[in-house]
Amino acid sequence: MFKEQETRMITVFGEGAVKVSPSTVHVVLSVVSRGTELGEIQQENARRMNQVIQSLQKAGVAEASIQTTDFQIRPVYDYVNGEQRFQGYEVINSIRMTSDELSRTGEFVDLAVKNGANQIGSIEFTMPNSDKHYQRALVLALQDAETKMITIGTSLKLQNRPIPLKIEEQHTSQPVAFRAVAMADTGKTPIESGTMTIRASLQVKYQIV
């Protein structure tokens, strides 16, 4: 009686990584104002934010590279002996600045703070062509899996080379390159873009024949 031969499988994981330098920086800058007279703090907040924007534009940041991302007006309360007491209002105005002059990031931050910004929301370095680098990492991951399979096959003294039957992409989070250090003796804020590592991971199932 014919008996179907059981399929023998080996699963290996391959990983690939590509290091690249980011090309764009995004900085979120905010002006936060507090007071009891809403009209006054709105005007003060607007004046300071306009000053921040104008200073960045004078430094070479294009108008199209500065975008308002958030504007809030909210009441501020304090709690004394379990009782809620009105303290005033808080106005928050945030912008997102984009630049390809990564070496000037610290300069832009210092300039914004000098002209009225009092909160730095985030500093993010990115690449416009990250998909291209990820494809390279995938190729390296597949090569890594193949190398591992050859090593396993040699160790097991397999007569035939295993056949890849299924390749599954494993999702991995991509880190954002950002490195900042404390204020230097020069009084400037040093911010370094560093490098970004694009990673890819694959699960490959091989059939042993």
Predicted segments with their positions:
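Short, charge-dense linear interaction motifs
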Residues: 1-115, 119-209
